[in-house]
Design a protein with these regions (language model features):
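Extreme N-terminal starter segment of soluble prokaryotic enzymes
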Residues: 1-4
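Proline-centered loop/turn at the N-terminus of a beta-strand
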Residues: 73-75, 91, 123, 142, ...
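Short amphipathic alpha-helix with an adjacent loop that forms part of the alpha/beta core around
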Residues: 34-43
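Catalytic beta-strand/loop cores that center a nucleophilic Ser/Cys/Thr
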Residues: 112-159
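Two-component/phosphorelay signaling modules centered on CheY-like receiver
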Residues: 17-26
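Acyltransferase
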Residues: 172-189
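A short beta-strand-loop structural module common to alpha/beta enzyme folds
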Residues: 26-34
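Cysteine-nucleophile active-site neighborhood
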Residues: 43-117, 181-183
């Protein structure tokens, strides 16, 4: 399997790439503004990395989702997760408290196979100041994990093989991060 990681100019991207490679997968990293959309045809899956700012400021990030939704499996992490939400009609909202290097607990619903084999209670390493809003969440998106404060920590598209996680699976603050990535890599829809 060969996956592409769309690098949204984030220092965590290569930690994510290293973890995915350690799971036995070939990885190519492309900066979000340094490729042609057609180049992604060569890859089996697309991983949308964390990054600063908001999705509309992240190069071709939204175009990748628009072009490959329903054609390629995708996983969005942090900014990538927010971009998935926004692309399908969700709103983003700023948090009153910024999370940077904070581990919080929450629940995963058990419906998303990326959480297969994990307990209902999970610990998530968080590095963000925005979340996908619950208000007006479109029907095509399903919440699959939330923080104890009720913030969306994971979602999936009901029709397409697209998953998003707000937290960082590559962080030491996410004990089950490798298992989540392994589950996603092993998914075939």
């Amino acid at each position: 399997m060969h996956i592409v990681i769309i690098d949204n100019y984030d220092s965590f991207t290569y930690n994510l790439a290293h973890l995915v490679k350690s799971l036995g997968v070939q990885v190519t990293v492309l900066r979000n503004d340094r490729f042609a959309l057609e180049e992604l045809e060569a890859f089996d899956k697309i991983l949308l990395s964390p990054g600063p700012g908001i999705p509309s400021e992240a190069g071709l990030l939204l175009d990748v989702i628009r072009t490959y939704a329903g054609r390629k499996p995708m996983l969005g992490v942090c900014l990538g997760h927010q971009a998935i939400g926004e692309m399908f009609g969700a709103r983003l909202e700023t948090l009153s408290d910024v999370f940077h290097g904070v581990a919080t607990e929450g629940n995963q619903s058990g419906v998303d196979p990326i959480f297969q084999g994990l307990p209902e209670r999970i610990v998530m390493g968080r590095y963000h100041s925005w979340v996908v809003s619950r208000d007006g969440l479109p029907d095509c998106l399903e919440i699959t994990a939330e923080s104890d404060a009720g913030q969306i920590m994971a979602l999936r598209h009901r029709e397409f093989d697209i998953h998003g996680i707000q937290f960082h699976p590559e962080s030491v603050l996410t004990p089950d991060g490798a298992a989540i990535l392994r589950n996603w890599l092993n998914l075939t829809k």
